[in-house]
């Protein structure tokens, strides 16, 4: 599995699309800027620290603990764009609100996934906004629904 080369914690491949372009929101110009990341995109579940807990035993975390984790052991899901333009790939980890302290959710520190006409918008735990452009609208809609599931906005 190619993804395991980049993330050895992969558990199961959930979705793959043949082509995605990553945009990053530039607050200075208040517009999207095309990045150099483009290629096949994969969404997958990962083995994580949470595999050892029952739902009612989950210890709530602050965002800095998650962001500062050395190997991403807290993320339940991953997204990876295998970059065709350069050797460096684009990746994001996903974790639902139920793992976060309530204060982090109330201060808007949680992950955010939205959909515009052309982009799936993801705000990570660092507050950076990325736009995922997928050519096929049906594939884009499916990926949006899957990412919403990954952050537990859909059951």
What are these regions (language model features)?
Residues 1-128, 134-139, 145-154:
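Boundary segments of small protein-protein interaction reader/adaptor domains
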């Amino acid at each position: 599995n190619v993804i395991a080369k980049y993330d050895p914690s992969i558990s199961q491949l959930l979705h793959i699309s043949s082509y995605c372009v990553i945009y990053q929101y530039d607050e200075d110009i208040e517009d999207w800027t095309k990045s150099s990341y483009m290629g096949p995109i994969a969404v997958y579940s990962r083995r994580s620290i949470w595999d050892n807990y029952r739902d009612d035993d989950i210890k709530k975390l602050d965002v800095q603990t998650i962001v500062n984790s050395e190997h991403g052991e807290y993320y339940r899901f991953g997204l990876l764009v295998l970059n065709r333009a350069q050797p460096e790939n684009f990746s994001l980890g996903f974790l639902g609100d139920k793992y976060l302290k309530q204060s982090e959710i109330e201060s808007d520190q949680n992950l955010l996934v939205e959909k515009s006409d052309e982009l799936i918008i993801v705000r990570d735990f660092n507050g950076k906004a990325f736009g995922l452009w997928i050519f096929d609208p049906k594939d884009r809609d499916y990926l949006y629904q899957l990412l919403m599931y990954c952050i537990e906005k859909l059951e």
